[in-house]
Amino acid sequence: MEEELRVRLNDHQVSKVFPVKPKSTAKPVSESETPESRYWSSFKNHSTPNLVSSVAALAFSPVHPHSLAVAHSATVSLFSSQSLSSSRRFSFRDVVSSVCFRSDGALFAACDLSGVVQVFDIKERMALRTLRSHSAPARFVKYPVQDKLHLVSGGDDGVVKYWDVAGATVISDLLGHKDYVRCGDCSPVNDSMLVTGSYDHTVKVWDARVHTSNWIAEINHGLPVEDVVYLPSGGLIATAGGNSVKVWDLIGGGKMVCSMESHNKTVTSLRVARMESAESRLVSVALDGYMKVFDYGRAKVTYSMRFPAPLMSLGLSPDGSTRVIGGSNGMVFAGKKKVRDVVGGQKKSLNLWSLISDVDESRRRALRPTYFRYFQRGQSEKPSKDDYLVKEKKGLKLTRHDKLLKKFRHKEALVSVLEEKKPANVVAVMEELVARRKLMKCVSNMEEGELGMLLGFLQRYCTVQRYSGLLMGLTKKVLETRAEDIKGKNEFKGLLRNLKREVNQEIRIQQSLLEIQGVIAPLMRIAGRS
């Protein structure tokens, strides 16, 4: 009995230490909905007509109502961003590869595989400018963010061209890429800065103000670069090549900040999206059919969405209300944010009183100058996000000699500026008179007192380095043309004596400098040989 009790006791202890559990079954994974996923899920799909061929490029107008330009085959179609219906079509001779809007939304530029860049008015079908210089297919075209007069384009000839649109001429050819140039972008903070990406695996940073082929910085992505975009700060850029997206710090010397390799196939397009929280996200699409949202501040993919076709292009409206993605089979996947029923945190209530107030508002008589409310209109109006700030032009205050020049009273303008005794202004007026070919005529018409002021000015400043290039030649001309008036006048003797002394002193200084140069030059040559 004792042994049987001991065995039962041991069995009881074992059952407590190792309790029997039912087999666990797989449960559906329920991800908690984040504000990020709620934001991107709020885009409601809209049906758009399928296009004939691959959608090569998408671009939204930067101004309200943010028209959409879609490049497909040899056509650019304009769509309304509100109804997503086609409003106008523009035809090209070859397949369109890129399209972009000007900062005011009045014009757009597009390039095709024939190497031609064309500029259109959105209300006209005829091209305003046709820019021909690329010797191979043109792959991208961009307007600077605020510059309305220039364009940047690049193509398979490996050349980046900076255009003067008004003159339809190339200002500078930026040479440096060793393979096809496929993408580029302009800085959001400096209209002269731009970046370009190439199939030679590099991204180059250029300054359009320097009319040479020397780039400012070079970044090696490691794979053929398909797209490059500036991030809103202007100090960071994002590059897409292969299945990776990388963020680089230009201010920090081109150092890589982070890398994302969540796509399975080549990334084809990048865009920057502005969230409701005023934060920015990097959005990418790829041939694997996925759209990825990347928080580059935390180096984390925050949202992913699958589409039933390889994706070629991406467009996001500036107001964040529309998202458009172009597929390789001509499909356009458009999404618009759902209209919320909540305004200011409270739901709209459709009661009888609101309906009556709406009717009363519609029946109110038009305001006229005879009504008191006419003079109070707009006082309580608050600015909206789509309003334009128009700066009042400040009136330019002209000096007396500027006013005289506007009236073509040349001699009076010269005498007036001589009386001010400001050498920089005097030389500026003289240069203007030289451009008008009136300087010597003014000198020949001067009275004795006015001629004395001119000689006094020449005596004091003709040897000053900043002004000597103009004043030395003018002094010689004045002495030759007014020699008879100067010789017999006692009041001019002192001025001529001082002028002669200044010129002789300048000659001695020049001779001394030449002697010093003669001594130093052989020593420099000897030092260079050793």
From Swiss-Prot:
Expressed in cells undergoing active cell divisions, including functional megaspores and the female gametophytic cells. Accumulates in roots, stems, leaves, inflorescences and siliques. WD repeats lie at residues 50-89, 91-130, 133-173, 176-216, 220-258, 262-304, 320-363. InterPro entries: G-protein_beta_WD-40_rep (IPR020472), U3_snoRNA-assocProt_15_C (IPR018983), WD40/YVTN_repeat-like_dom_sf (IPR015943), WD40_repeat_dom_sf (IPR036322), WD40_rpt (IPR001680). PROSITE patterns: WD_REPEATS_1, WD_REPEATS_2, WD_REPEATS_REGION. It is found in: Nucleus, Nucleolus. It holds the Pfam family UTP15_C. GO terms for biological process: cell division; embryo sac development; megagametogenesis; rRNA processing. Its main location: nucleus. SMART domains: WD40. One of its GO terms (cellular component) is Cul4-RING E3 ubiquitin ligase complex. The keyword Secreted does not apply. The keyword Nucleus applies. Keywords: Cell cycle, Cell division, Developmental protein, Nucleus, Repeat, rRNA processing, WD repeat. Disruption phenotype: Embryo sac development arrest at two-, four-, or eight-nucleate stages, associated with abnormal nuclear numbers and positions in embryo sac, aberrant embryo sacs and unfused polar nuclei. Disrupted progression of the mitotic division cycles of the female gametophyte leading to an impaired synchrony of female gametophyte development. Reduced root growth and accumulation of unprocessed 18S pre-rRNA. One of its GO terms (molecular function) is mRNA binding. A motif (Nuclear localization signal) lies at residues 392-399. Essential protein required for nuclear division and organization during embryo sac development in female gametophyte, probably by promoting rRNA biogenesis essential for the progression of the mitotic division cycles during gametogenesis. Involved in nucleolar processing of pre-18S ribosomal RNA. This is Protein SLOW WALKER 1. It comes from Arabidopsis thaliana. The gene is SWA1.
